Regions:
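Extracytoplasmic/secreted cell-surface and envelope-processing proteins
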Residues: 107-111, 293-296, 328-330, 415-417, ...
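Non-catalytic, conformational "gating/processing" segments within enzyme and secreted inhibitor domains
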Residues: 28, 82, 119-291, 310-392
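C-terminal soluble interaction/assembly domains
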Residues: 367-369, 375-426
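Hydrophobic/aromatic-rich, well-ordered segments within soluble, folded domains that form packed cores
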Residues: 86-104, 212-227, 414
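Detector for small/aliphatic-rich hydrophobic stretches
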Residues: 2-180, 378-381, 421
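Short Gly/aromatic-enriched secondary-structure transition segments
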Residues: 111-115, 231-238, 296-307
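Structural recognition of the beta-strand scaffold that forms the well-ordered cores
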Residues: 86, 94-97, 283-286, 406, ...
């Protein structure tokens, strides 16, 4: 089975004062999308250094704390009540860290504080993402994982050369010119870039562009993984999924009996199951007891994840899991302000590390993530696996009510994606 997940976040920067027509010499140095940056380590090097591991692991606990803080804000937002939640915590952190590399003073401090990086130096964060992107970017037969950035710059707008160099070097960023004064054409060009990077999974993210936008920072992540042990499509059947006490939907329910890591956290009213992809990535499924989702959402944090990891044990499990394909889009402006990042959106924003030409501020931060889960796949469909099962009654895990998912990358200790499947058919 190939699980396909795509993510993209957009940070749009608007001028905070009157924007005059550009004059000669005020451009961003001819940076275009014609060249594709490869990290100097070499993406084909399969052996990350201790330095790379340490740099990634330095960010991991801060990124996990940010992930759960952001999840709780999203889950409690009236705008997403009853809806699916899905986002890439590490992608959002990466986009905001790129933004922070062009911020100064209180604006920079607020972004770093909101991300949990107050005790870290900018260089540590930049190098952490450089190594993280490198380590995530190893494409293997059973897995494809790509992460990087794009910087779309208004034609004639002058951007600090150091910012562009850092964006390319640390954040695997490509830079290209866009005529934002023609919003429809600009949106089409940016959407084309995003579609290419997400394997056409996210195709129409940017629309209704403000013609006064000067710059757009884009972060993308694309993941395609094959289950370590695929589901047999002949066992997939129709079943009910209880969205809430008043709503039941019918889903295609996959079934598999196999050895899985499982833990029943009685104290926290949760069953936790780890379903591995091939290589170093896995899906952690968190299934709260009936009526306990809100309680679990309010309390869950990175310490739960570590505790569950430590207590998981291999057991025979009858797993029933719905096939689904969901897409979630959210504006993060309000949530990020609640997390203390206020100046970036205000006229007092200081992005002098990004441009000295005019005062700019962030106009909006938008993210979109797409998750598809099924039992099919080119290799998986042809694969045959045999497991030796113990002669004992298996545990039964039926995902027929809302559950949480976390896509974890073990070598970097990263939460690549997380969310709540509230309605697999929505």
């Amino acid at each position: 089975m190939w699980g396909r997940i795509s993510w993209c976040s957009i940070v749009a920067l608007l001028v905070a004062t009157a924007w005059a027509a550009p004059h000669e010499g005020h451009d961003h140095g001819g940076h275009t999308s014609d060249h594709h940056h490869h990290l100097h380590h070499g993406k084909d090097d399969p052996h990350p250094s201790h330095e790379e591991m340490d740099a990634c692991h330095l960010l991991a606990p801060h990124n996990a704390d940010f992930a759960f803080s952001l999840y709780k804000k999203l889950a409690s937002s009236p705008a997403v009540e009853g809806k699916n939640i899905f986002f890439s915590p590490v992608g959002i952190s990466m986009a905001l860290s790129l933004l922070a590399s062009g911020a100064k003073g209180e604006t920079h401090s607020q972004i770093f504080s909101g991300l949990g990086y107050s005790q870290l130096k900018s260089q540590q964060v930049n190098e952490g993402y450089e190594h993280l992107i490198h380590m995530l970017g190893h494409n293997r037969d059973a897995m494809q994982l790509e992460a990087g950035s794009g910087v779309a710059i208004r034609e004639g707008f002058k951007v600090q050369e150091q910012f562009l160099k850092d964006a390319q070097h640390y954040y695997n960023s490509e830079t290209f010119s866009v005529d934002f004064s023609k919003p429809e054409a600009a949106a089409q060009e940016i959407n084309k870039f995003i579609a290419k990077k997400t394997n056409d999974k996210i195709t129409n993210m940017v629309k209704d562009l403000d013609p006064s936008v000067l710059m757009m920072l884009i972060n993308y992540m694309y993941f395609r993984g094959k289950w370590d042990k695929p589901f047999d499509s002949t066992l997939t059947h129709k079943a009910n999924f209880q969205v809430d006490k008043d709503t039941t939907v019918q889903v295609d329910m996959m079934k598999r009996n196999g050895r899985y890591e499982i833990y029943q956290d009685i104290e926290n009213h949760t069953t936790v199951l780890k379903v591995p992809y091939k290589n170093s990535t896995s899906m952690m499924i968190v299934l709260p007891d009936d009526g306990k989702m809100k309680e679990v959402e309010e309390s869950i944090c990175r310490h739960h994840i570590k505790n569950w990891h430590d207590k998981l044990f291999r057991s025979s499990v009858d797993l029933f899991m719905p096939k689904f394909s969901i897409s979630a889009t959210s504006k993060l402006d309000g949530i990020l302000k609640e997390m203390g990042m206020t100046d970036a959106f205000d006229d007092k924003a200081d992005f002098s590390g990004l441009t000295k030409e005019v005062k700019v501020k962030v106009s909006q931060v938008v993210h979109q993530a797409v998750l598809s889960v099924d039992e099919k796949g080119t290799e998986a469909a042809a694969a045959t696996t045999i497991e030796i099962m113990p002669m004992s009654l298996p545990d039964t895990v039926i995902l027929n009510r809302p559950f949480m998912v976390l896509i974890l990358e073990d070598s970097t200790k990263s939460i690549l994606f997380m969310g709540k499947i509230n309605n697999p058919t929505a």
